[in-house]
Amino acid sequence: MLQLFNQLLHKGIQSISPCLLCGIDRQQYHSLCSDCWEQLPWLKQHIERHEQNILCAHHYLFPIDRVILTYKYEQQLQYQNLLAQILLDLRLPKVQAIVPMPISTQRLADRGYNQMLIIAKIM
């Protein structure tokens, strides 16, 4: 019951909040308006390297490159749900665990958080 309430509350807040990229339209897709969501530099293929499939959601181009950099280095945590949902939308094969890449203790002290640990917890 509490989970349902939280989901409804989140949807309500999202429907009146501005898009995280353009700030103009209302959020419709994981914190973005439909125009910004459609204009993300989607990568619609798998990359094969050394007989392994590598899944990648986007080309590292604007605006996704800015989203990643500001989330990672400028503590803009409002992007955490967007990045987690983009990864979830990859339709990953059945996995048993998601393991964030560890960062050095110095980087952790500098940033104050492990950005991928936050995303892994959301996923």
Question: Which residues does each predicted region cover?
Answer:
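Glycine-rich phosphate/pyrophosphate-handling loop used in enzymes and phosphotransfer proteins
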Residues: 1-123
